[in-house]
């Protein structure tokens, strides 16, 4: 089979002085950072959908890309051609993982029977490609939002037959993920929300999606899948308001249905932007709540109100993200999946490499900065000092529930407490972060 990316052998590390646009300047997979290989810290993945399914179309224009597998032809043969190119790309980019939705890799067909048959064939084909290339599956998922049947949601749909179709897709995609050795399974509810409350029963829809997630957990254990289940928060788009708004909202949902020990979150940077949060905030919140799982690494445009899915290029932003992740022990089953796409005007096929190479170098630099922050330990020391009072006898009695509200009030009165405010030193800490970023 003729190579699609025939002008490139493989992207390799050439160092910071390299001027080769098809080489890594900072991402060196075997470089040790805090005693661990860079590749093992970052666990990079490339996504199937933006990279091989999008044709460059937008709300105002038709597709601008010339992709051989997007031409008229027999659907399964085109899907196999797409898989051939995808795995050529994964191998040449030197990413250890990839991610997919069911209908990214397989034609949906005109019926449920066709869907199941097509997907079964493509799962076998993907298994062959994984074995040949050594590329592994970070996570799989089901697309329960694109087809018109999901206009009013999947698990939250007012029609139980639509709910049942979605259940079939999720069961099938979970089984496929398990068969392919996937390390996680993701659930993103793009249509799980509402456009108007005038025709929406919030309590009913919440009960539906809660039961759906409980059944997903039950199925995971039934088939012996050892990976992590992940919900991906997003506040809106395509739905006006989505039920998985942000990390805190997802945690509240999980607690309501007794799922907080079973499901974690896959956090996307651009979704944090849309929710009015920083990427750093969402990562830190997930870690604090004990539900951090994986990351969709990209960036949004703060001047635009939609999901632009651009490649991450900010070392400043991502250094703080990597600092939180590494400090918390790093990824287990999760990783950094590039849920990002080239721009509509980027029609050269090698633009796919330029986008990913820049993103991988960005995250490598961010990791190195995070390592300097951790090794120095100054930020941790200052935070510990700020909360040191809670290690006192009074602080520990409060936290351990040994004092009631009235008893604390009595203590304050008896000891004539008159605490004064201590500086938070925000500006000093911001300067310290800049030191790690820019002073070598």
From Swiss-Prot:
Q: Give a yes or no for keyword Metal-binding in this entry.
A: yes
**Could you tell me where this protein is found in the cell?**
Cytoplasm
User: Where do the annotations place Mg(2+) 1 binding?
Assistant: 232, 268, 296, 339
Q: How is the cofactor bound?
A: Binds 2 magnesium ions per subunit.
- Could you tell me one molecular function GO term of this UniProt entry? magnesium ion binding
Any transmembrane segments, and where?
Answer: none
According to its UniProt record, which reaction does this protein catalyse? alpha-D-xylose = alpha-D-xylulofuranose
Needed cofactors: Mg(2+)
| Matches recorded under PROSITE patterns | XYLOSE_ISOMERASE
- Active site per the UniProt annotation: 101, 104
List ligand-binding residues for Mg(2+) 2. 268, 271, 307, 309
Primary enzyme class: isomerase
| Entry EC no(s) | 5.3.1.5
**InterPro entries named in the record:** Xyl_isomerase-like_sf, Xylose_isom_bac, Xylose_isomerase
The UniProt keyword set, sorted, is: Carbohydrate metabolism, Cytoplasm, Isomerase, Magnesium, Metal-binding, Xylose metabolism
Q: Which GO cellular component terms, listed alphabetically, does the Swiss-Prot or TrEMBL entry include?
A: cytoplasm
GO terms, biological process: D-xylose metabolic process
Name the domain of life: Bacteria
| Family affiliation | Belongs to the xylose isomerase family.
Subunit record text: Homotetramer.
* Protein name from the UniProt record: Xylose isomerase
Please name the taxonomic classification of the source.
Answer: Bacteria, Pseudomonadati, Pseudomonadota, Gammaproteobacteria, Enterobacterales
- The protein's gene is named xylA
């Amino acid at each position: 089979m003729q190579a699609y990316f025939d002008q490139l052998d493989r992207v390799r590390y050439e160092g910071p002085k390299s001027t080769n646009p098809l080489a890594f300047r900072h991402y060196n997979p075997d470089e040790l950072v805090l005693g661990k290989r860079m590749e093992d810290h970052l666990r990079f993945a490339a996504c199937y959908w933006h990279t091989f399914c999008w044709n460059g179309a937008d709300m105002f224009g038709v597709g601008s890309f010339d992709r051989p597998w997007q031409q008229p032809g027999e659907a399964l043969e085109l899907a196999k051609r797409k898989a051939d190119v995808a795995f050529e790309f994964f191998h040449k980019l030197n990413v250890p993982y990839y991610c997919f939705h069911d209908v990214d890799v397989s034609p949906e067909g005109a019926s449920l029977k066709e869907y199941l048959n097509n997907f079964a064939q493509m799962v076998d084909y993907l298994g062959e490609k994984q074995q040949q290339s050594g590329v592994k599956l970070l996570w799989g998922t089901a697309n329960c939002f694109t087809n018109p049947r999901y206009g009013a949601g999947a698990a939250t749909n007012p029609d139980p037959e639509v709910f049942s179709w979605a259940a079939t897709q999720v069961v099938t995609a979970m089984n496929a993920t398990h068969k392919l050795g996937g390390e996680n399974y993701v659930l993103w509810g793009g249509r799980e929300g509402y456009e108007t409350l005038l025709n929406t029963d919030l309590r009913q829809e919440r009960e539906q999606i809660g039961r759906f997630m409980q059944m997903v957990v039950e199925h995971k254990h039934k088939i012996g899948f050892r990976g992590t289940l992940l919900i991906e928060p997003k506040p809106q788009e395509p739905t006006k308001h989505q039920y998985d708004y942000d990390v805190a909202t997802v945690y509240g949902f999980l607690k309501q249905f007794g799922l907080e020990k079973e499901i974690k979150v896959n956090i996307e940077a651009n979704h944090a932007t849309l929710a009015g949060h920083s990427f750093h905030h969402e990562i830190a919140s997930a870690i604090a709540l004990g539900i951090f799982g994986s990351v969709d690494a990209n960036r949004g445009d703060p001047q635009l109100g939609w999901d632009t899915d651009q490649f991450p290029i900010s070392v400043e932003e991502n250094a703080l993200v990597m600092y939180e992740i590494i400090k918390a022990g790093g990824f287990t089953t999760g990783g950094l999946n590039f849920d990002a796409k080239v721009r509509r005007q980027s029609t050269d096929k090698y633009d796919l490499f330029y986008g990913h190479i820049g993103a991988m170098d960005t995250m490598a630099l961010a990791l190195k900065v995070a390592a300097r922050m951790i090794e120095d330990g100054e930020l941790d020391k200052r935070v510990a000092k700020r909360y040191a009072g809670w290690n006192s006898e009074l602080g520990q009695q409060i936290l351990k529930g040994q004092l009631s509200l009235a008893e604390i009030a009595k203590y304050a009165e008896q000891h004539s407490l008159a605490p004064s405010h201590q500086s938070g030193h925000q500006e000093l800490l911001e300067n310290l972060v800049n030191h790690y970023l820019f002073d070598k």
